[in-house]
Amino acid sequence: MIQMQSMLEVADNSGAKKVMCIKVLGGSHHMVAKLGDVIVVSVKDAIPGGKVKKGDVYKGVIVRTKTGVVRPDGSTIKFDKNALVLLNKQDEPIGTRVFGPVTRELRAKKYVRIMSLAEEVL
């Protein structure tokens, strides 16, 4: 579960490495974000020459969480780190590749484009 001030890794090749959550979108009482939710983030660490730079504010969709997700069959999928993919103003991924695995739950949230860019879908 991701809340305000949470630090996340970036799972795409947009140029950002670390981001911090500054707002969880989805209603006035939406305090935490789970897998597939959209949050507003600030770039805290970026590589030189990337598409984004430090201090920029973007939306991002969460693709991996330490808390994990429980499937209908009772199995749980957890990851070592929290990660997200940065989105532009039209809610499309900024990067052209997604590193690491993503979960099938993104399909229900209408993020099929991220699933097609990912190396592995669990």
UniProtKB/Swiss-Prot annotation:
| Any one Pfam family match given in the protein's UniProt record, by short name | Ribosomal_L14
Q: Which cysteines are joined by disulfide bonds?
A: none
Name a single GO cellular component.
cytosolic large ribosomal subunit
**InterPro entries referenced in this protein's UniProt entry, alphabetically:** Ribosomal_uL14 (IPR000218), Ribosomal_uL14_bac-type (IPR005745), Ribosomal_uL14_CS (IPR019972), Ribosomal_uL14_sf (IPR036853)
Whom does it interact with, and what assembly results?
Answer: Part of the 50S ribosomal subunit. Forms a cluster with proteins L3 and L19. In the 70S ribosome, L14 and L19 interact and together make contacts with the 16S rRNA in bridges B5 and B8.
Q: Which HAMAP family does UniProt cross-reference here?
A: Ribosomal_uL14
Name-wise, this protein is Large ribosomal subunit protein uL14
